[in-house]
């Protein structure tokens, strides 16, 4: 073998070993692991392979645009913790990511030799215009590859001034997705490279980054509010000189993924919403090369332009190898009527095949070894010939050293033109019981391999010898196919393939294997076959081997279930010219291959599922209930004239999409439950609708009953591996544990619930490795579990489930993933399976390559039921006919011939590359009908490149933009009767087209129908002339043509929904009884083409009434209708049960709809009118009586000019009791415990906190202990009481409305007052607030109006309480009648107490939960106002960080309010409360340290934006840092105070991460007001982030302070100075405890009094004193007053006749008032620890009035509180 193989990128290692007298060189495996592999050894990994076999694969084509280098083995990346929050540049540059460079480095010395630059080639990468960020670009060529060598220089650093490079056309795409795919070599000196990619780059402080330094690969993101980087175990950085294929995708929703050489660099990262929003308009993608000291980054990026590069030559001399020696071999033959095989009796080896006089070799050299668990064994073989076609081999396999003791039976059988290689029996003599524990996993037969035993080969001595194989590629620019001539000499080959064929000019052969092997990720996954070049004598042979099989496997000693085992099997098929083109090649082999291949379950349905879409339910909103989805199916059935449909139900379970994962049988109750789901399944069959569900087998949420500690995946450090965080913080599971512990049972539970009829299961996420091994074998086992229930298998990724899946979401949803992560890009694979899968690259021109008008199309998926907010019905239908009808038409045929054109040059996504387009594809069906698809031009710059001509049996059925295509199948694929056969017509352009009809259509008349959502309309009778018709019709409008007249099927709308046509889809109101002016009620369409009822311009009340059917007697129901009222006229829903009438109404709608999956949200493309939607559901709750025969529902609108819109009426059982503890809508105290919410978050609706989004507020279900306080450090309960609470996840610092009530849900009547109470949990102080508003709260693009809200911030609930807290507020209805209450996200940041990332999310610091909402109408009294105010103010007076003077004034005012008379008037109470509010606003913070405002000047050397003021801002995340160029150690930081100020010491707070600039030795000089200098020094401070103190030992009245770091830590040492904070402490006078001696003495004296009145006075004083003490209200003046008051009390015997009694300075309540009547404020009011918990800035501007009130009210308060005592 050629020594050059070792120098290739693949680093393929070939070893020789003797087999008797022959020496065979074989290649068996790739060096590396799949990115989806986790804890255990998996198929294809290095650990799985025999020591004597090869450990990598060779590249078939060195420069074909793919890097086949084997990935390195990386540690399990997990999901390590991250730290969120504002960061400085330096903190984010820890771990040597962003470090300054020396001003004068020693030298620039890239490792690579100086390149030779071709004169005619220009660089593709350019350095940026900013001079500080410029590097160098040169062109170099090495080993037949051209590169742009990018280098950083001495002027660069690794932070603000790295070398940056850009490439024309490489930007974030129009959908907001960023995709980077590049091949590069690292030419830096070892360990000195700092390279990576900036995505959505604004500047070095605002971006997303993926790259590496000496410690390995990491991600990082930066924004003004949130910045962090990856802190987990890293994948190692590339070795110097290594070739790397880097692929990065950043989706518009913030999901970041990256791999290098097909190894995932980290688990999926989801950017915080704040970061994603901040960067959403940034388009730049740049490469970065950093410098540090004399360390330079030098990388060579492979260019797109490889023209003119001298490639490596094939070996010049012929190769020779050992000759065949069969002298000791005994051969036999087995044969069928057409195929003969020569076989070795000593081993199941085929020497040669003969077919019709032509031959193909098998394994020509002798081979006799099996590899069990990667241990090579020469078995003892017993040969037995069964009959002429079949031979059997009994193998005894022993290896005592490795505990192998087994027998295996292998059968070779010839069947027609096939050779079957089957392991028919395996006996493991070790005791192995599936599902049970085994003491030593070595006793398992984990893997079985016959690598080295080629099943079929081709020789260079044969004419036309070729090998053709397909690997996985999802890059639209790069085909996964290899086409290799087998010659001598030729390049070495050892590589894994999904499909492989060998051929000569006479015969072609294909091989199938059920091996579920992965040699790695990407192109190395799904490698069931291994192709290997072997030199025998003077000929080269390329043989196809089955890759390794998996058999018995286990998880930590638990043997996997029996069903995971699959007996090894492989088949060879040999054929001559199968497509009759007089040429034999791989295509003939591929046609024959279909006779031996596996067929994924349900593949027969694929061709007929033309109308795929997603119906979305999310966040408890039940946007698309099951039975409403049924109406959507009927609507599409009409609009497509009966095409088959596929509906993926995202959110069928729990509270909707991405909630309750792993509990597959938890059918969503709010969307209809099991009963409605089964009805949907059954009724959908009639319309050929195939239903599937979205599930997740990789992560779980705490609400799921399957969430438990054992199943959860952990990181290497023992922390949990967190997954998706939206409604809840998910945690990844260990998929292997799940498999070993009964995953199958969950599918079986679902099957029991639903019965038969469900068509497919779509497995989300699986394939990215977040649950461990998601490779070929693990995926096949998962698919088998699903198939076992009778369900088709579907998956998310284009590369996922290649063996079993029939639908791949990222392939079909063309906007997903970017050009590197689409469908399967392999002509070989598509040739074989085009009719079986929707897995192909579709037509999405901007992706380029295969995506630029694939001839066979490719599914293009759109939606109209809420997925990604897509509710554009017309757009869905247009796309279906423009893209999908012809794609599905082709799938009714199998491909028989594929002709490529000449390569074209394409430029897109920052790449210029060669692509070879298919120019002509032939297809045939079982009846020999022939379809030919031809591209009109091979010129990519011609419009005709994107046009095709399609003929059926020679007759044109598509010509460019127009098609008239026959469709002779019903929705389920059954052939139509002749009179129902039809043709679809569609043209993307207007204009006349002429068509020849088939002979059996050439009658005098045919009938054309326009297709709409009402079915076939506008019938036209067309005359056929000379067998032709001419059509001149609308563009982008579907039509259907029939031989004879047709009618539409009768639709029974809204089956099971108790009303006819809940969504007004029938196009008529004839089912309603209309009173009033019926002409004012009509069906119209929204901007999203959604049908609605509109009532407008009516001069009298208009009502529409319909009977509700199918109701149960004496049963509680809820009914709602969506309403958008643009009029002030009252719009109502009324239910009359015959015994009772229930009505709910709304005036003008005031809340925009922000629910993304709702068809009526306020996105422009879904809006009602005027680009807005105020649709919200309006409910009536009612109870039926004994007679349900005449229950009616009425929609009405009173007279008015403007429009009211209604849509989506839904009636269903509901057991809530919200109205005075009764079910029916009515008066009384409103109570919502969230236990029986009908739908949504009633009585609230979602606010604009996220804009139109899949909102993060939902009904949370209890699963103790995982949803509750304590588990995994959780601080708050997700569920407060009962089984359900309302949870908001992570919506802090938004300054926007989270949710609100609306009048139709609860009406605060004008002038009436209500007490609103609720229990709540909040993870941080004042991040959420209770608000009262009126009218529309405008947010988002309409601006925010928080200043109009009455806002009450809510403290956290866990630092001082073991359970949720209760909040009470008084709300008075505005005269406008549109008052509402809600929860608001303030501008305050959460306090995560040092936790970060998933821990911070899971533990609830950012969350808010509500329960037990109660709204009670009350008669407002002054007492109520005072009690409510006290609850709000008492937490504030408990604070200790305000000055005594300002706090005492507040305390005394609050105490006086607490002592107010019960009969205080409302006006008096409000006046007193206003005064207290002014005092609260006037509180003055204590000064404990110097702040920036205390200084007249702050002078110090500093890096830009990292000045000395940062050390006085109270934020440890910001730094003072000297210049990153170094050289500032020993330079002073000088601080001059405005006024001499007393200080007592310095506390130095180092940076929180990293060590650059940490002070080691310091000198501190403090100059006092007299000019005297006080000098202090410190030496050898340790290098950590703990504070360091210098205690002056005295108080100095300082005027100037000079701090000098004379020695510092960090890279290189003594280069920088830095500080997070410099805290110069001020002397603190300890507050003297209140002197109670006078009071106590007076009390002792007063207690001796005997008069009853005096005793009551004393008791009253004691009670008031106790109340004041308990509630932190006591002041010195109050103590003095209480003592004086007691001292003046005297018994009647000693009282003077006319006593002079001081009028009380402080009000005292009577003793009766104190006994059992004073609220226990300690119980109800929490006392936060810091003032920020009570009085943070809201982020809203304060009015001038408020400022004036604060100053004036101080004077007013004195009149109330301070009274001069008489002598």
UniProtKB/Swiss-Prot annotation:
Residues 602-893 are annotated as: Catalytic. A motif (LPXTG sorting signal) lies at residues 1735-1739. Residues 112-124 have a biased composition (Low complexity). It catalyses: a 3-O-[beta-D-galactosyl-(1->3)-N-acetyl-alpha-D-galactosaminyl]-L-threonyl-[protein] + H2O = beta-D-galactosyl-(1->3)-N-acetyl-D-galactosamine + L-threonyl-[protein]; a 3-O-[beta-D-galactosyl-(1->3)-N-acetyl-alpha-D-galactosaminyl]-L-seryl-[protein] + H2O = beta-D-galactosyl-(1->3)-N-acetyl-D-galactosamine + L-seryl-[protein]. Its main location: secreted. Ca(2+) 2 binds at residues 1233, 1235, 1281, 1284, 1411. One of its GO terms (molecular function) is carbohydrate binding. Ca(2+) 1 binds at residues 577, 579, 581, 583, 588. Residues 61-124, 301-324, 1711-1730 are annotated as: Disordered. It holds the Pfam family Gal_mutarotas_3. Was identified as a vaccine antigen as it provides significant cross-protection in a stringent mouse model of lethal sepsis. Keywords: Calcium, Cell wall, Glycosidase, Hydrolase, Metal-binding, Peptidoglycan-anchor, Secreted, Signal, Virulence. Residues 1-39 form the signal peptide. GO terms for cellular component: extracellular region. The modification Pentaglycyl murein peptidoglycan amidated threonine is found at residue 1738. Residues 1739-1767 form a propeptide. Belongs to the glycosyl hydrolase 101 family. A subfamily. The hydrolysis reaction catalyzed by SpGH101 proceeds with retention of the anomeric configuration. Involved in the breakdown of mucin-type O-linked glycans. Specifically removes the T-antigen disaccharide (Gal-beta-1,3-GalNAc-alpha) from extracellular host glycoproteins. Representative of a broadly important class of virulence factors. Is a multimodular protein that comprises seven distinct domains. The catalytic glycoside hydrolase domain resides in domain 3 (residues 602-893). Possesses four potential carbohydrate-binding modules (CBMs). This is Endo-alpha-N-acetylgalactosaminidase.
């Amino acid at each position: 073998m050629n020594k050059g193989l070792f120098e290739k990128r693949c680093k393929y290692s070939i070893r020789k070993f003797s087999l008797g007298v022959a020496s065979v060189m074989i290649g068996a495996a790739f060096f590396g692991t799949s990115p989806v592999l986790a804890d255990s050894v998996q198929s294809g990994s290095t650990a799985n392979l025999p020591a004597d076999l090869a450990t990598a694969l060779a590249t078939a084509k060195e420069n074909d645009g793919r890097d086949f280098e084997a990935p390195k083995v990386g540690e399990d990346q997990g999901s390590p913790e991250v730290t969120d929050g504002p960061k400085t540049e330096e903190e984010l540059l820890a771990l040597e990511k962003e470090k300054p460079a020396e001003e004068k480095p020693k030298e620039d010395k890239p490792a690579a030799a100086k390149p030779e630059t071709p004169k005619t080639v220009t660089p593709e990468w350019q350095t940026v215009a900013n001079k500080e960020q410029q590097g160098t670009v040169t062109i170099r060529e090495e080993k037949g590859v051209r590169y742009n060598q990018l280098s950083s220089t001495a002027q660069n650093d690794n932070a603000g001034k790295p070398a940056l490079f850009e490439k024309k056309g490489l930007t974030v795409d129009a959908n907001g997705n960023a995709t980077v795919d590049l091949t590069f070599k690292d030419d830096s000196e070892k360990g000195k490279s700092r390279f990576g990619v900036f995505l959505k780059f604004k500047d070095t402080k605002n971006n997303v980054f993926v790259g590496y330094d000496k410690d390995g690969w990491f991600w990082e993101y930066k924004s003004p509010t949130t910045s962090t980087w990856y802190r987990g175990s890293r994948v190692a950085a590339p070795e110097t000189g290594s070739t790397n294929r880097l692929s990065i995708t950043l989706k518009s929703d913030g999901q970041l993924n990256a791999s290098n050489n097909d190894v995932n660099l980290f688990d999926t990262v989801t950017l915080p919403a704040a970061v994603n929003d901040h960067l959403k308009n940034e388009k730049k993608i740049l490469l970065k090369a950093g410098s540090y000291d004399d360390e330079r980054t030098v990388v060579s990026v492979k260019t797109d332009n490889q023209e003119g590069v001298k490639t490596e030559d094939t070996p010049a001399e012929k190769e020779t190898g050992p000759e065949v020696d069969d002298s000791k071999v005994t051969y036999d033959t087995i044969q069928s009527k057409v195929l003969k095989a020569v076989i070795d009796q000593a081993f199941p080896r085929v020497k040669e095949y003969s077919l019709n006089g032509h031959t193909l070799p098998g394994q020509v050299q002798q081979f006799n070894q099996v590899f069990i668990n990667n241990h090579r064994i020469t078995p003892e073989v017993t040969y037995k010939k069964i009959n002429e076609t079949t031979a059997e081999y009994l193998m005894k396999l022993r290896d005592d050293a490795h505990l192998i003791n087994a027998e295996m039976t292998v059968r070779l059988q010839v069947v027609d033109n096939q050779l079957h290689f089957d392991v028919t029996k395996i006996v493991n003599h070790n005791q192995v019981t599936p599902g049970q524990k085994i003491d030593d996993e070595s006793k398992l037969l984990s893997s079985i391999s016959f690598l080295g035993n080629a099943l079929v080969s081709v020789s260079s001595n044969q004419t036309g010898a070729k090998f053709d194989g397909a690997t996985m590629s999802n890059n639209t620019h790069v085909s996964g196919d290899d086409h290799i001539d087998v010659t001598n000499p030729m390049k070495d080959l050892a590589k894994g393939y999904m499909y492989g064929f060998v051929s000569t000019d006479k015969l072609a052969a294909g091989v199938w294997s059920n091996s579920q092997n992965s040699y790695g990720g990407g192109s190395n996954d799904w490698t069931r076959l291994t192709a290997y070049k072997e030199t025998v004598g003077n000929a080269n042979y390329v043989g196809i081997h089955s890759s390794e099989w998996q058999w018995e496997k286990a998880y930590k000693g638990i043997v996997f279930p029996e069903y995971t085992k699959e007996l090894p099997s492989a088949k060879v098929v040999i054929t001559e010219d199968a497509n009759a083109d007089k040429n034999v090649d791989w295509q003939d082999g591929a046609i024959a291959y279909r006779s031996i291949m596996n067929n994924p379950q349900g593949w027969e349905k694929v061709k007929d599922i033309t109308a795929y879409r997603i119906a979305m339910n999310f966040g408890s909103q039940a946007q698309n209930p099951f039975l409403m989805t049924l109406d959507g199916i009927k609507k599409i059935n009409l609009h497509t004239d009966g095409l088959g449909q596929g509906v993926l139900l995202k959110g069928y379970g729990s509270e909707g999409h991405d909630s309750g994962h792993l509990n597959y049988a938890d059918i969503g109750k709010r969307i209809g439950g099991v009963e409605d789901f089964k009805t949907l399944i059954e009724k959908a069959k009639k319309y050929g609708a195939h239903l599937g569900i979205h599930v997740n087998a990789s992560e779980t949420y705490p609400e799921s009953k399957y969430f438990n500690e054992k199943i959860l995946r952990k990181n290497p450090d023992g922390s949990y591996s967190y997954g998706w965080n939206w409604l809840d913080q998910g945690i990844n599971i260990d998929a292997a544990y799940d498999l070993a512990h009964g995953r199958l049972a969950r599918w079986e539970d679902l099957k029991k619930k639903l019965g038969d009829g469900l068509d497919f299961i779509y497995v989300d996420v699986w394939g990215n490795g977040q649950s461990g091994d998601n490779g070929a074998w693990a995926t096949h086992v998962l698919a088998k579990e699903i198939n076992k229930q009778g369900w088709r298998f579907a998956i998310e990724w284009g590369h996922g489930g290649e063996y079993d899946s029939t639908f791949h979401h990222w392939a079909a949803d063309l906007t997903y993933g970017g050009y590197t992560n689409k469908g399967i890009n392999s002509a070989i694979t598509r040739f074989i399976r085009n009719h079986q899968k929707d897995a192909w690259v579709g037509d999405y021109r901007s992706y380029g390559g295969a995506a630029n008008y694939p001839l066979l199309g490719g599914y293009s998926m759109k939606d109209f039921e809420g997925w990604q907010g897509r509710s554009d019905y017309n757009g869905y239908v247009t796309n279906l006919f423009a893209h999908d009808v012809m794609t599905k038409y082709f799938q009714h045929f199998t491909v028989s011939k594929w002709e490529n054109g000449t390569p074209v040059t394409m430029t897109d996504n920052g790449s210029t590359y060669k692509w070879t387009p298919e120019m002509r594809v032939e297809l045939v069906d079982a009846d020999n009908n022939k379809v030919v698809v031809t591209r009109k031009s091979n010129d990519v710059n011609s419009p005709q490149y994107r046009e095709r001509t399609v003929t059926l049996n020679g007759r044109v059925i598509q010509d460019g933009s127009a098609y008239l295509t026959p469709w002779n199948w019903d929705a389920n694929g059954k052939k139509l009767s002749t009179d129902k056969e039809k043709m679809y017509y569609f043209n993307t352009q207007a204009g006349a087209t002429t068509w020849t009809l088939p002979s059996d259509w050439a009658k005098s008349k045919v009938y054309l129908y326009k297709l709409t959502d009402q079915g076939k309309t506008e019938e036209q009778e067309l005359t056929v002339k000379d067998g032709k018709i001419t059509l001149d019709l609308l563009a982008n409008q579907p039509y259907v043509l029939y031989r004879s007249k047709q009618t539409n099927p009768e639709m029974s709308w809204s089956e099971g929904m108790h009303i006819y046509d809940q969504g007004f889809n029938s196009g008529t109101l004839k089912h309603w009884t209309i009173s009033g002016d019926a002409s004012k009620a009509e069906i119209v369409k929204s901007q999203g083409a959604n049908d609605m009822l509109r009532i407008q311009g009516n001069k009298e009340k208009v009502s529409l009434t319909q009977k509700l059917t199918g109701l149960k007697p004496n049963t509680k129901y809820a009914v709602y209708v969506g309403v958008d009222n643009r009029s002030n006229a009252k719009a109502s829903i009324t239910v009359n049960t015959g015994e009772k009438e229930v009505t709910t109404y709304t005036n003008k709608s005031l809340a925009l709809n922000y629910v993304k999956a709702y068809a009526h949200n306020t996105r422009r493309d879904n809006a009602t009118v005027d680009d807005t939607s105020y649709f919200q559901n309006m409910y009536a709750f009612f109870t039926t009586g004994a007679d349900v025969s005449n229950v009616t529902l009425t929609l009405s609108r009173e007279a008015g000019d403007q429009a009211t819109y209604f849509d989506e009426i839904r009636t269903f059982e509901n057991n809530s009791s919200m109205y005075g503890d009764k079910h029916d809508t009515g008066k009384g105290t409103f109570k919502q415990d969230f236990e029986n919410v009908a739908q949504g978050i009633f009585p609230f609706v979602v606010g604009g906190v996220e804009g139109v989004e899949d909102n993060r507020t939902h009904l949370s279900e209890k699963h103790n202990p995982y949803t509750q306080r304590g588990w995994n450090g959780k601080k708050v309960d997700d569920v407060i009481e009962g089984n359900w609470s309302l949870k908001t996840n992570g919506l802090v610092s938004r300054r926007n409305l989270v949710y609100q009530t609306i009048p139709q849900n609860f009406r605060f009547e004008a002038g009436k007052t209500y007490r609103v109470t609720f229990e709540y949990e909040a993870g941080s102080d004042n991040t959420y607030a209770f608000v009262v508003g009126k009218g529309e709260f405008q947010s988002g693009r309409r601006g925010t109006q928080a200043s109009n809200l009455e806002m009450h911030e809510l403290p956290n609930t866990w630092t001082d309480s073991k359970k949720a807290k209760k909040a009470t507020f008084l709300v008075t209805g505005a005269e406008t009648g549109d008052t509402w209450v809600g929860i608001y996200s303030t501008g305050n940041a959460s306090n995560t107490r040092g936790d970060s990332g998933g821990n911070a999310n899971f533990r609830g610091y950012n969350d808010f939960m509500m329960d037990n909402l109660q709204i009670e109408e009350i008669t407002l009294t002054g007492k109520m106002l005072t009690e409510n105010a006290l609850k709000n103010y008492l937490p504030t007076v408990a604070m200790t960080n305000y000055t005594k003077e300002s706090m005492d004034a507040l305390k005394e005012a609050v105490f006086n309010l607490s002592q107010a008379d019960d009969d205080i008037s409302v006006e008096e109470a409000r006046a007193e409360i206003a005064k207290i509010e002014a005092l609260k606003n006037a509180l003055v913070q204590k000064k404990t340290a110097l702040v920036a405002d205390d200084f007249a000047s702050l002078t110090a050397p500093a890096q830009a934006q990292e000045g000395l003021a940062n050390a006085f801002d109270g934020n440890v995340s910001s730094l003072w840092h000297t210049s990153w160029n170094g050289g500032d150690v020993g330079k002073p930081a000088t601080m001059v105070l405005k006024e001499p100020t007393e200080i007592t010491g310095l506390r130095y707070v180092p940076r929180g991460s990293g060590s650059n600039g940490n002070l080691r030795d310091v000198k501190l000089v403090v100059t006092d007001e007299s000019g005297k200098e006080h000098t202090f020094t410190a030496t050898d401070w340790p290098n950590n982030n703990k504070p360091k103190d210098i205690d002056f030992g005295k108080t100095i009245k300082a005027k100037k302070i000079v701090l000098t770091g004379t020695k510092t830590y960090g890279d290189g040492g003594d280069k920088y100075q830095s500080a997070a904070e410099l805290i110069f402490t001020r002397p603190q006078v300890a507050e003297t405890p209140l002197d109670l001696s006078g009071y106590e003495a007076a009390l002792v004296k007063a207690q001796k009094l005997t008069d009853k009145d005096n005793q009551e006075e004393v008791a009253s004083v004691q009670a008031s004193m106790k109340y004041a003490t308990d509630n932190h209200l006591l002041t010195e003046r109050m103590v003095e007053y209480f003592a004086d008051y007691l001292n003046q009390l005297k018994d009647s015997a000693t009282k003077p006749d006319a006593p002079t009694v001081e009028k009380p300075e402080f009000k005292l309540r009577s003793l009766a008032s104190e006994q059992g009547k004073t609220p226990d404020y300690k119980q109800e009011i929490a006392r936060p620890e810091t003032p920020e918990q009570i009085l943070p800035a809201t982020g809203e501007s304060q009015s001038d009035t408020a400022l004036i009130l604060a100053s004036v009210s101080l004077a007013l308060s004195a009149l109330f509180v301070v009274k001069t005592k008489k002598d």
